[in-house]
Design a protein with these regions (language model features):
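Non-catalytic cap/lid and distal C-terminal segments of serine-dependent acyl enzymes
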Residues: 1-256
């Protein structure tokens, strides 16, 4: 079951409302006393429905969770879909100046985004659904810029999020700043991170291999449960990320 809401994000949208998709696991309305972990996701329009997806293809996450009977609530919030590429600011921890068509530079507003997720979105979900609201059952995930935000959330807000899945995280950033953030992060040993990158992404983004390896090595030096993958034939799109769900979701649900 997927419920849809429209809620405001005042610091970015003013009175404009964005869509929030909430997946409730199979049996939610039968087992009335059972509570569930929650996975918060970026780019919510791309998570469940092809009709809503930015490029016409979603992750198909609801179908996967139904088929696997995964006992997990998912709260997926829509990103800034406007032509001004405001998403790149909302999802960036650092000043971001991408190459080519994306313009820039973009002001970093990742902390504002996470403050809203923690202080507004999480209480909204916890007050309406049977969640397990503690840190140990609060997860976060995304791809591309949402993958970068997943890393940021675990590194800077490890007191709220215990587990994350970062698929093809955007790494054409100031990699030195990200590495410094990783080194400075105080992560508890029960932190779980899944991070992957597509083999084909390395072919057309010359910086990506070194940045992925460098960040993965630093993350590996932390006392956490880390799973990194190089995806054969993997690309930077939803069709490819959908195929990684059998790896990412079981990692998030490890020993739950």
């Amino acid at each position: 079951m997927i419920k849809k809401f429209k809620i405001t994000y005042p610091c970015f949208t003013g009175p404009e409302k964005r869509r929030l998709y909430v997946y409730l696991p199979r049996g939610y309305n039968i087992h009335k006393t059972k509570h569930y972990p929650v996975l918060y996701m970026f780019d919510g329009q791309n998570v469940f429905f092809d009709d809503n997806a930015t490029y016409g293809k979603s992750w198909g996450l609801g179908k996967y969770l139904n088929q696997t009977k995964t006992p997990l609530i998912v709260a997926a919030y829509e990103c800034n879909c406007h032509a001004d590429n405001g998403r790149l600011s909302e999802y960036s921890p650092f000043y971001y100046n991408p190459q080519g068509e994306w313009g820039g530079p973009y002001e970093p507003r990742a902390e504002e985004t996470m403050t809203w997720f923690i202080n507004v979105l999480k209480p909204f979900i916890d007050s309406r659904f049977r969640t397990l609201p503690d840190r140990g059952h609060t997860f976060i995930s995304g791809s591309s810029m949402g993958g970068l935000m997943t890393l940021y959330a675990l590194l800077k807000h490890n007191d709220v999020f215990s587990r994350g899945a970062a698929l093809s995280p955007t790494l054409d950033i100031d990699i030195d700043q990200l590495c410094q953030m990783i080194q400075a992060a105080e992560l508890t040993p029960d932190t779980v991170l899944y991070m992957d990158y597509g083999r084909r992404e390395f072919d057309y983004e010359s910086w990506s291999r070194n940045n992925f390896v460098r960040s993965a090595q630093l993350l590996g030096s932390k006392d956490i449960l880390l799973s990194t993958r190089l995806v054969p034939e993997g690309e930077h799109n939803e069709a490819s990320w959908e195929k990684q769900l059998p790896f990412a979701i079981p990692t998030l649900m490890y020993n739950i």
